């Protein structure tokens, strides 16, 4: 899930040009917020010395990301980004060594990439070099450090070690004696997503302990004051000199930060930590505004302005923020960052900071906006209607509905109270009181639920949702290392993300898959970019830098991270140098390192989509075949009819059609249907104008078919509105008329229906459609019976919908079979043909698919008609242009697929 960045900006005194660049990054670059990007807010794409054939320009160029000639920059919507080479805070590349598990060692490159205490000092090294051992950064001895600085730091470390007690360690033998960086303490980190859950009991214990320590310290200070009054000035001075000052590690705003939760520690260490927490030194008193509890917008390089709340340093479990910086808790995922005040704006600047494009594209951003406006409306006393829903998908959609009036209120200036009403209440300004309770509630409640009432019944532990598993790229690296060492079975881990919550096997490669990655795979497996290649990695459904297969008939991509991790270090560079490079699905070998292709992957992939149902429905009613002498002509209601593919197939099968009622609004489609079927179609206009009375008048119907527009359902469209807005709502018109056309109770005549839509739709939309239709879909790809890729979901009760798709002798399976004389196909199959003209171009180099007269050429209209299975010149009416005819074909069904689905109807209706 896209996530918020948690690393602070690099320099509080950046130049005007840099700030302008940051502003442009937020407005123009719409990168999904992946996990590794939170570690590396300004990650540069890896460079390769040799210009490769896998060149692909990203759709949006970042101002701080140089072009990569051999790898491709991708930005997935819920994908995890894991950089193959990570950047240190000072911009130096980390050097990888073999990962070696080390219990409790902090991952320097974990989500948020926070340095442990004392790491801020590493910023003084201009050329720091570290070796990564299972995510643990180890400084090289004396590397790039001036001798004087090393000596001074050594003295400071000795002094600090005296004060730290149980926390201090003797440094020797491992290069720590000359290091500028203190040994970091083990930290319990958590990842982007729902805020870390802390029970009320544990929170109360921590608060009580902090209060006790504060009282102890007050008594000690009072006792010391009493002693000083009785002692002379000389003795008092000796007492002061006897205790060296405690070393406070400042938090460098340039250092990446990680959201951490204070760990319960031993009593000794706890006393010392609590003493630090009780420090009375005022916080954020530099006169630059943005006090504790204020709602703000924060800006990090490469990301849009994001809403957050100023919090005290003790909330983060880290050290104090340096002067001129603030600790910010980001709404949406509950992570923390240090941000300089120049990169902060009050929430009242909503009009200038809110970014509509990011809101449309990123669920995490929508969630963040919802949460901050909930807090703002609560402070301002502004009431909004609350939607209560049962499951997660309903809740998310209710949030969408509730967000609209709140955003309008914010864009209007938070009236009537204005910015004054957004100020934090007095109790929130005191960091040592029990505040921010909404941050510690259960993850689901913190994400979506409205503010709870003051008193509510105590929930049982059984009712509390589970905290999500803590995983990141370091987790996957560690588990893969254990697999290499024969300590773990690869089938027991999710090879996509590293989770141990495996629910099924990966359909293509040996290894497991978790539920979250399954949902991503369902959405992204058939999502293609403009170049015809998959939008995301075949293994993890993510990846920012991908390698594209050199086989013209393959459209798969593999990200650099998965290749280097599973195949072996350096495998990505070797693939870049190989030209052409056949991917791991096309190669002759079946095994590449730990990446082993399943021998039966085609059937597994089919079963993956056939059995991907998280809802169970009663099987559809089965109608026995009708005796031949009792069969009657079929009566059809076709909604969103297009160019009458249904009628064409029924005629091809020899089924007699008594009545064919079609709802269609496209004039060109209506013209084709009228001309090609000699006026046998009764067109009834817009589907929204058809009423139950019309259904009774035109019926009864034996078959209802349709496929609503996919524009607002397809995840390829970043501005999609979903199932409940825009053209997505037309599905409910199909559902309404299907309900009206069903036989009345007691009428046992055969009644069939079919609904079609894209595979690349959101999991929640697919689940909602299935819930309304009380049926799970079947996925059918036209590439099995035609010369084009065209994967679609089909819901319905037609007999044998799940049977294998088999081609006939008349099906044209190769592009060459569809071409006119003298034309040569450069590809055996073309990618999905859509309404866009550039969908005809193929491959990463955007080649035309046909070669004629020693030149490349596009597909002719007659050839496209053959690809779809239509008769030649089927759309050649009323002097339509080539582009207009392609639009009609791009919205149509594949004739061989519909023939496959309609064939069993011959057992129920009269045939010619």
Swiss-Prot record:
> Per the record, which residues fall in region Interaction with DNMT1 and DNMT3B?
199-403
Q: Where is this region: Interaction with the PRC2/EED-EZH2 complex?
A: 494-586
Zn finger (GATA-type) ranges are 493-523
Compositional bias ranges of the Low complexity kind? 113-128
The Enzyme Commission number assigned here is: 2.1.1.37, 2.1.1.-
About its domains, the entry says: The PWWP domain is essential for targeting to pericentric heterochromatin. It specifically recognizes and binds trimethylated 'Lys-36' of histone H3 (H3K36me3).
Instruction: Spell out the protein name for this chain.
Output: DNA (cytosine-5)-methyltransferase 3A
């Amino acid at each position: 899930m896209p996530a918020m960045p948690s690393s602070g900006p690099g320099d509080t005194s950046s130049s005007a040009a840099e700030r302008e660049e940051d502003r442009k990054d937020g407005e123009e670059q719409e990168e999904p917020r992946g996990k590794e990007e939170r570690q590396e807010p300004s990650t540069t794409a890896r460079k390769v010395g040799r210009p490769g054939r896998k060149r692909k320009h990203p759709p949006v160029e970042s101002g701080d990301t140089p072009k990569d000639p051999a790898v491709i920059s991708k930005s997935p919507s819920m994908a995890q980004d894991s950089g193959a080479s990570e950047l240190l805070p000072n911009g130096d590349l980390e050097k990888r060594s073999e990962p070696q598990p080390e219990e409790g060692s902090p991952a320097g490159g974990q989500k948020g990439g926070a340095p442990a205490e004392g790491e801020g000092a590493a910023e003084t090294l201009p050329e720091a070099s570290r070796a990564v051992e299972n995510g643990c950064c180890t400084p090289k001895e004396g590397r790039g450090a001036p001798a004087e600085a090393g000596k001074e730091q050594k003295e400071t470390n000795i002094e600090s070690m005296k004060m730290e007690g149980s926390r201090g360690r003797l440094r020797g033998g491992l290069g720590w004696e000359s290091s500028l960086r203190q040994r970091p303490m083990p930290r319990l980190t958590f990842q982007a997503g729902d805020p870390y859950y802390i029970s009320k009991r544990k929170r109360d214990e921590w608060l009580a302990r902090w209060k006790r320590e504060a009282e102890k310290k007050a008594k000690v200070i009072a006792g010391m004051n009493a002693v000083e009054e009785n002692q002379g000035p000389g003795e008092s001075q000796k007492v002061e000199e006897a205790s060296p000052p405690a070393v406070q590690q400042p938090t460098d705003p340039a250092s990446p930060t990680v959201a951490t939760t204070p760990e319960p520690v031993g009593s000794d260490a706890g006393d010392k930590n609590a003493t630090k927490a009780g420090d009375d030194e005022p916080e954020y008193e530099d006169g630059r505004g943005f006090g504790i509890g204020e709602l703000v917008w924060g800006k990090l390089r490469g990301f849009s302005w994001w809403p957050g709340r100023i919090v005290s340093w003790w909330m983060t479990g880290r050290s104090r923020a340096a002067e001129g910086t603030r600790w910010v808790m980001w709404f949406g995922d509950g992570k923390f960052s240090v941000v300089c005040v120049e990169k902060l704006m009050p929430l009242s600047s909503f009009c200038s900071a809110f970014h509509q494009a990011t809101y449309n594209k990123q669920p995490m951003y929508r969630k963040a906006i919802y949460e901050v406006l909930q807090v703002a409306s609560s402070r301002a006393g502004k009431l909004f209607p609350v939607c209560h829903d049962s499951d997660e998908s309903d809740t998310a959609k209710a949030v969408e509905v509730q967000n609209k009036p709140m955003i309008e209120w914010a864009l209007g200036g938070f009236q009537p109270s204005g910015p004054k009403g957004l100020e934090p209440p007095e109790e929130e300004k005191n960091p040592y009181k029990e505040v921010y309770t909404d941050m510690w509630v259960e993850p689901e409640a913190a994400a979506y639920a409205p503010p709870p009432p003051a008193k509510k019944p105590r929930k049982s532990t059984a009712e509390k949702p589970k905290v999500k598993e803590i995983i990141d790229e370091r987790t996957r690296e560690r588990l893969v290392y254990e697999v290499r060492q024969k300590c773990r079975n690869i089938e027991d881990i999710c090879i996509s993300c590293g989770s141990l919550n495996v629910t099924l096997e990966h359909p293509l490669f040996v290894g497991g898959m978790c539920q979250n990655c399954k949902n991503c795979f369902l959405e992204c497996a058939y999502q293609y970019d403009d170049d015809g290649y998959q939008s995301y990695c075949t293994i993890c459904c993510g990846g920012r830098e991908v390698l594209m297969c050199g086989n013209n008939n393959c459209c798969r991509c593999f990200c650099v991270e998965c290749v280097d991790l599973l195949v072996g270090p350096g495998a990505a560079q070797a693939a870049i140098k190989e030209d052409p490079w056949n991917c791991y699905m096309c190669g002759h070998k079946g095994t590449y390192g730990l990446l082993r292709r399943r021998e039966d992957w085609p059937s597994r992939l089919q079963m993956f989509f056939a059995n991907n149902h998280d809802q169970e429905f009663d099987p559809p009613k089965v109608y026995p075949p009708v005796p031949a002498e009792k069969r009657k002509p079929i009566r059809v209601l076709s909604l969103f009819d297009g160019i009458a593919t249904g009628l064409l197939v029924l005629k091809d099968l020899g089924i007699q059609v008594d009545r064919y009622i079609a709802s269609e609004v496209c004039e060109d489609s209506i013209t084709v249907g009228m001309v090609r079927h000699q006026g046998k179609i009764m067109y009834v206009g817009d589907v929204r104008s058809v009423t139950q009375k019309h259904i009774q008048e035109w019926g009864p119907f034996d078959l209802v078919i349709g496929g609503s527009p996919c524009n607002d359902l397809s995840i390829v469209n970043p501005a999609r509105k979903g199932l409940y807005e825009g053209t997505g709502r037309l599905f409910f018109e199909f559902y309404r008329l299907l309900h009206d056309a069903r036989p009345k109770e007691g009428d046992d005549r055969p009644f069939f229906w079919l609904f079609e839509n894209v595979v690349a739709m959101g999991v929640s939309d697919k689940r909602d459609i299935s819930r309304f239709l009380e049926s799970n879909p079947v996925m059918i790809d036209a590439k099995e019976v035609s010369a084009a890729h065209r994967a679609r979901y089909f819901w319905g009760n037609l007999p044998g919908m799940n049977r294998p798709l088999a081609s006939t002798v008349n099906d044209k399976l190769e592009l060459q079979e569809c071409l006119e004389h003298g034309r040569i196909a450069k590809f055996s199959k073309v990618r999905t043909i859509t309404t866009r003209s550039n969908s005809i171009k193929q491959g990463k180099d955007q080649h035309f698919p046909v070669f004629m007269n020693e030149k490349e050429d596009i597909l002719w209209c007659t050839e496209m008609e053959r690809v779809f299975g239509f008769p030649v010149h089927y759309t050649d009416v009323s002097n339509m242009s080539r582009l207009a005819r392609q639009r009609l074909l791009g919205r149509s069904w594949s004739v061989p697929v519909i023939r496959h689905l309609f064939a069993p109807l011959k057992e129920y209706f009269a045939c010619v």
